[in-house]
């Protein structure tokens, strides 16, 4: 099973769009889009990872 990943190298960003493309984090929390998820990844110092695309 290939690991799913998201490139968060351009983050954090000060503001995210309201675009809804959900991702499920390793914390079992649904993030509304890549920007929200990547900001959380940066805040977690890389401990948060992508579980899968779509809602948890």
Swiss-Prot record:
Gene3D superfamilies, sorted: 3.30.60.30
Annotated keywords: Disulfide bond, Glycoprotein, Protease inhibitor, Repeat, Secreted, Serine protease inhibitor
A GO term for molecular function: serine-type endopeptidase inhibitor activity
InterPro entries: Bifunctional_prot_inhibitor, Kazal_dom, Kazal_dom_sf, Prot_inh_Kazal-m
The keyword DNA damage is assigned to this record: no
Glycosylation sites: 45
This protein's GO CC annotations: extracellular space
Residue ranges of every copy of the Kazal-like domain listed in the record: 6-56
Major site of localization recorded for this protein: secreted
Subcellular location field: Secreted
Site feature: Reactive bond 3: 18-19
Pfam families: Kazal_1 (PF00050)
Disulfide bond sites: 8-38, 16-35, 24-56
Domain notes: Avian ovomucoid consists of three homologous, tandem Kazal family inhibitory domains.
Protein name: Ovomucoid
Organism (species): Lophura nycthemera
């Amino acid at each position: 099973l290939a690991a799913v990943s998201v490139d968060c190298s351009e983050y954090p960003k000060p503001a995210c769009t309201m675009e809804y493309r959900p991702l499920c984090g390793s914390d079992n929390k649904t993030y509304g889009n890549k920007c929200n998820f990547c900001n959380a990844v940066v805040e977690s110092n890389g401990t948060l990872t992508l579980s899968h695309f779509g809602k948890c």
